Each structure stands twice: as C-alpha cells, then as structure tokens.
C-alpha cells in the first residue's frame, strides 16, 4: 500500500519541505499506521476497498475540476481548494477573508497534537498528506452574505488531499455548500473544521459524488458555541468506497444542531456515515435523520453516538 509505506519508511525519505503539522501527524500515524478494525468506527469497513484507497499514488498537484451545472452562477462565491487564488471579499454588511498561515498552523497543531490516533486517524492522514497550497482557512462575519460554494476534487489514478478551516464570528448568518468531486479510479481525503461563534447560524450542505471506482474519506469537525445553530444536509453517491465522519461539539450546550443525511449505493459500493455528537453543557438540541438507499450487493452503513455530560 503506497500510503502506508510512506508512513512507515525512514525519516531520511521525508522531504525538507514537510511542514510541522505534517511531521506531527506522521509521528502519530507511525504509532498506528492502519486503524484497528476492532474499533467500532472501523469495524464494518470493507478491508479490500480501504486498502485500495491507500494504494493510490499521492499528488498535491492541482487539477481543474469538471463541475456539473452552470459555470457562471450569479451571486454565488465559488472557491476551489488548491487553485491558489487570494480570497478577500468585503461589503458593507459582511466580510470573508483568509486566515494567516500561522493561524492555520497553530489551529491544526492544537487540534491534532493530543488527538487519539484511532478516533482521529482520518484527520491525521489528511494532515500528513496535505501541503499548504491545499489548505484554505477563512474568517467569515456579517449578514446577507452570498452563498459560498467550496469545491474539492480528485484526479484519475491519484489520491488528493484537501483541508478546509472556517471561523464564523458572532452574529453571523451564512450558507456554505461543499461539493466533493471524485474522478474515476481516484481517491480523495478531506478534513473540514468549522468554529461557529455565539448567536451565529451556519447552513451547510455537503454533496459528495464520484465516478467509476472513485473513493473518498471525508471528516467534518464542528464546534458550536452558545445560542448558535448548525444545519447540515449531506448527500453521498456513486463512490465505490465512501466514508463521512461527523464530529460535532456543543462546547457549552445551549446550541441547536439539525442533521439530515442521504447516501445511495449500487452494485458492490460501500458508503458509511459515522456521527459523534457531544453535549458539553445543558439545553442542547439535536434533530438527526439519516436515510440510505442500498441496491444490489452494496452496503450502506450509519452509526451514531451521542455524548452527554454526567
């Protein structure tokens, strides 16, 4: 497996351009190169499909995605991760600006340095693979913000990795769509982080669709503060191997979370969703619904865990 060999090989073969985040992630992965399938969140994973995901040759090169639909949609801000375009949009009522590289590195280091290697294996793999040009960090504030569309894509015969970090300031309302596009016979690793401040609302849609023999591991990490609202709708289909890991933390309680998910499988595909919702304070609200359509010999998996304070 190409990726596992890269993890376990000598430090002498690691590039001098490797970032501190990549080195920390690599050190942690070396203690647990492959997740233990006895762990609940990995127990039902199809081993042969997972191994195939890890066997792709990795690249950080950018490829123009084949985006379906209209190419010039009015009043939508489209961002393609890896395109290397500067982002700074400001109007009277709102602002979207990039986080500084140091802010991004400090944030990621804080999140991964004490992370459990099994529960956070997918994030660690992503951060080991992703270089700086495939990481986007945004700070969003205000109201009447036009919808954001964020594109991640993989390239035929390669594994690509992308990271997204978004901080949503207080009293902000925003709608964000993530479109994950898997080219045929490819693999895509995505880690997304959203910090939602007090009295803010994030309407979040995720559409992940692939072509023949496409693969994806997609992790979503959300922190909600008091009186915030997070509304997630997700759709996954046409992936030979697809995995969505949702981790939501109501940091102080008193927040509202709505999750609606749909996954569609055919032939011998496997698509899985794992949702972990933590309430670290009183008066939290959760409404969660996940639906699956599984045809032929395919497998559709959903597991949910709710953690409440003692």
Question: Where do the model's predicted regions map?
Answer:
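Glycine-rich and polybasic anion-binding loops at the starts of cofactor/ligand-binding domains
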Residues: 1-290, 301
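C-terminal structural cap/anchor segments
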Residues: 290-310
């Amino acid at each position: 497996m190409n990726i596992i060999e890269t993890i376990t090989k000598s430090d002498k073969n690691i590039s001098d351009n490797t970032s501190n985040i990549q080195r920390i992630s690599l050190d942690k992965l070396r203690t647990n190169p492959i997740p233990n399938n006895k762990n609940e969140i990995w127990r039902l994973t199809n081993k042969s499909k997972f191994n195939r995901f890890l066997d792709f040759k990795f690249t950080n090169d950018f490829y123009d995605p084949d985006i379906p639909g209209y190419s010039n949609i009015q009043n939508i801000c489209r961002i393609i991760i890896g395109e290397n375009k500067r982002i700074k949009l400001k109007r009277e009522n709102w602002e979207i600006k990039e986080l500084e590289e140091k802010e991004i590195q400090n944030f990621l280091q804080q999140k991964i340095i004490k992370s459990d290697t099994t529960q956070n294996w997918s994030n660690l793999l992503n951060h080991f693979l992703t270089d700086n040009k495939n990481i986007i960090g945004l700070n969003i504030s205000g109201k009447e913000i036009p919808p954001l569309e964020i594109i991640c894509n993989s390239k035929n015969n390669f594994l690509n990795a992308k990271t997204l970090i978004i901080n949503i300031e207080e009293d902000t309302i925003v709608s964000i769509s993530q479109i994950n596009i898997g080219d045929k016979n490819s693999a895509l690793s995505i880690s997304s982080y959203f910090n939602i401040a007090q009295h803010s609302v994030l309407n979040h849609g995720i559409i992940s669709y692939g072509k023949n023999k496409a693969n994806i591991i997609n992790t979503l990490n959300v922190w909600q503060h008091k009186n915030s609202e997070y509304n997630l709708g997700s759709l996954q289909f046409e992936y030979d191997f697809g995995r969505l890991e949702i981790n939501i933390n109501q940091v102080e309680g008193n927040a509202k979370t709505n999750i609606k998910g749909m996954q569609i499988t055919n032939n011998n595909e496997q698509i899985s969703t794992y949702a972990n919702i933590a309430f670290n304070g009183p008066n939290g609200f959760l409404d969660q619904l996940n639906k699956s359509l599984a045809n032929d010999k395919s497998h559709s998996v959903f597991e949910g865990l709710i953690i409440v304070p003692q």
